[in-house]
């Protein structure tokens, strides 16, 4: 599976890693797994690392379900999502997704964050856990 994750119970942080070619279906499958995972507690923070992704097979029209999925994340008790997207392709794609979610749900930018560096990621994560 191109996106795997583990849940840190003590910090309520989901650390996910995407690899290889990632499609919209694989992202949707991953998100469904998070929503259905009964071990994940309310107040979780999701961190997804796209550093080792070789390509994203995603189109704008395929992103249409994502704002609705955000509703399910909120119902599950998501505190924030942080996407580490260091390449131009991944950063641009996830900024597009971030905008779609923010427009649909009037989500504050600090709840759905896309960062380009590990340093930004660690700063944001410390801020959210505190």
Predicted regions and their residues:
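Amphipathic, Lys/Arg-enriched alpha-helical "gate/interface" segment within cytosolic domains
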Residues: 2-130
